[in-house]
Design a protein with these regions (language model features):
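Canonical P-loop GTPase G-domain recognition
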Residues: 117-168
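Histidine-anchored nucleotide/phosphate-binding helix
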Residues: 92-102, 107
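Conserved nucleotide-binding/hydrolysis micro-motifs of P-loop NTPases
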Residues: 51-53, 84-87, 114-118, 143-146, ...
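Conserved beta-strand/loop subsegment of P-loop NTPase cores
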Residues: 75-82, 103-115, 134-140
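Walker A/P-loop
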Residues: 166, 171-172, 176
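Loop/turn-to-beta-strand initiation segments
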Residues: 77, 107, 158, 208-212
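N-terminal accessory targeting/assembly segments
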Residues: 1-91
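Switch I (effector-binding) loop of TRAFAC-class P-loop GTPase G-domains
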Residues: 179-212
Length: 212
């Protein structure tokens, strides 16, 4: 039997697809590797299953866009997370992400996280960097809830990804939006004020009336 679904998680060679009939765990046909195509979260696919909850992806439908990092397809908005304290904002990375959005028909939204512990100079410099771009800039705090309701409204009806440096609070923000996720949270290196990488794979969750 053939179904159409959306990939919400990929781990190794196994992909979890969400359909109106529930979730199915599928493998991709070998021809995708030969053609240099890798299924990613957000892809809409056709797949065949014998009815045991397992199946085989037979076709990846036309993508609206494709992000490489994070690996995701058919994205509406990219939440670019900067810290208002430490680690200091990497504007070069943020600008690269914005450029990727512009080339991929994705709306960038800039999140200034950790505003509850902000360094005023860092916060105001980040505002000045992007205030004339026309992009939405949202001060948020995963810790005290500042801006979370506005962020939920941004996600509603959209497929969104979070991107930014390690330790800027991406996982903490997602936990604040959907506490049941319980994503692992990294911290800063005491020596170099840089983040420790904690997120190991890309995944979509249905939250706040949308996907992230």
């Amino acid at each position: 039997m053939e179904y159409t679904g959306r990939i919400i998680k990929g781990v190794g060679s196994f992909y979890t697809l969400l359909t109106d009939n529930g979730e199915f765990v599928c493998k991709a046909r070998g021809r995708f590797r030969k053609e240099g195509i890798t299924p990613v979260p957000g892809d809409y696919c056709r797949f065949e299953t014998g009815g045991d909850g397992k199946g085989c992806i037979t076709e990846i439908l036309t993508r609206k866009n494709l992000l490489i990092r994070p690996a995701a397809a058919n994205i509406d908005k990219l939440m670019i997370v900067l810290s208002s304290s430490l680690p200091r904002p990497d504007y070069c990375l943020a600008d690269k992400l914005i450029m990727q959005c512009e080339l991929s028909d994705i709306t960038p939204v800039i999140l200034l996280n950790k505003c509850d512990e902000m360094d005023r100079e860092t916060y105001e410099a980040a505002l000045a960097q992007y205030k004339d771009t026309g992009y939405d800039i949202i001060p948020v705090s995963a810790r005290d809830g500042t801006g979370i309701d506005r962020l939920k409204a941004e996600i509603a009806g959209s497929t969104c990804c979070f991107a930014g440096q390690s330790a800027v609070g991406k996982s903490s923000l997602m936990n604040a939006l959907a506490p049941g996720l319980e994503l692992p949270v990294g911290g800063l290196s005491d020596k170099i004020d840089r983040g420790r990488h904690t997120t190991r794979h890309a995944q979509l969750w249905q939250v706040c009336g949308g996907c992230m």
